[in-house]
Amino acid sequence: MEAEASGRNRFLFISNGHGEDAIAAAVAARLPDTVAVEAYPMIGSGNAYAGVCPIVGPRATLASEGWRNVKGSLRRDIATGGLATVPPALRFLRKVNGKYDRVVVVGDMVGVLACYFSGHRGLTYLDVYKTGAARLYSGPERWAIKQACKTVFCRADNLARTLEHIGVDARSAGNVMMDAIPYGDYDARTRRSRALAVTLLPGSRALTSESFALQVDALRSLPAEMRPDVFLAVAGSVSVDELARKTGLKRTPMLSVEPSDLGELSDGDLTIHMARGGAMGNLLATSDLVLSQAGTATVQALGLGKPAITFVNPRDRRSRFTDEQMLFGEARTVVTADAPAIGAALRKLLSDDEERRRLGNIGRQRIGGPGAMHAIIDALMG
């Protein structure tokens, strides 16, 4: 095998989404130098791997960007040529079968199934999709996992138990999302001037600018004396110019030398401090709550004890949204997709310190803490 001939262990990370890329990159970055790592982001640019490891495999884009929380996303992907992305992915995976000492799948069953159908076995699977609060693994999912995977890391004990019962080495060692919160070179605290702060997490996909505009309208509805400091985590695939255009805000020049600083958006009344998504942890550390339409980032914010306000878009796939809410509970406040409703939820939380603390504690308890990263690295290097 090529991996054996090189004298150096070769690992391939396969991920299928922005949040999944970030988690996989965080794991890869913690591996020792004795491991040569490559990454195959199945969807999107894979920007999260920049500076961590080389990217391999065909690039693919989908209308949904892999986001299955929106109704009809699969139909739209198929209608816009999404099926055409499957053959190149399977060809690549067949071509590299046997060339890596370890293949690590991060995400949902898409990566596992792609590997199964291309002949890969003995996978390490980091399931960051299923929460254990609603649906467990289906019969076909359990069968595919047993065939293709050697070790599975689950987010919940009940998920791991369902796999253990069929002979799979399944573990629940903590929430790897909490180990993978990104921190960068950005001093959010020195930008604070008000009593409270809010971080905006509008997401990383097609609806980002639309979501951001609603969040900004809600902030504008607040009385001046209640306005918090506002921070925005900008995912790598998001256009700041589009965010500015959608909201009527103007981008100010970047004044600091911090690599993660993206300047400000302002209209003279409302100012939003922007940082790269790679510094999201910095923003959350100094914030009291979040307005979030994101996936992975919402989980991470709740796990840090930051209550979230999320609005339901008419296009959201309600089954997935409901499954998530069973896990998040009261820690995530859900409102309709209009600025007055979002603004009312904001006013309530900004004016009630005790309620924020209560919801923050619920989030920490529901999401669970870090710890999975150490177990994952041990398993990969064992």
Model regions: which residues?
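Nucleotide-activated sugar donor-binding and catalytic core shared by glycosyltransferases
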Residues: 1-382
